[in-house]
């Protein structure tokens, strides 16, 4: 885990990860593996919708704001990631303005110990659910575009006001 100042980064093809995902792309990498990154500081601690862990695969650079985890032999990387994404960090993080999950505290975190077969079944189900969520999000984005288009079709562009509607102050 090595930070690179924004002014010193050379643009490239390799993702540069921080606590909450890709921050940039750089021309070199320090990892080439299947890993889980867990926020160390500046993470979405306490969020029920934004994860504190995410999975990375292949060549990448990770800065010092994320813990880099490589699962042990009998732990599936996706299972580890799903287990940590919304982990309850109450009482584990410290810091008033920028919460931090220290390495010592991270090592105290526990996930359910189940067989690899059970892990893979859980991961399969969660990936199916994630697929449904992704599909529904795309549908919602399409509906949002439709609403905007219908508004303009029905009332015209609010800035140019082609139907000369009266205007009121908000």
Feature locations, PLM:
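Non-catalytic DNA-recognition/assembly elements of restriction-modification systems
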Residues: 1-18, 108-124, 135-170
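Short, flexible active-site-proximal loops enriched in glycine and acidic residues
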Residues: 76-77, 91-98, 116-122
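Residues at helix-coil transition
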Residues: 85-86, 156
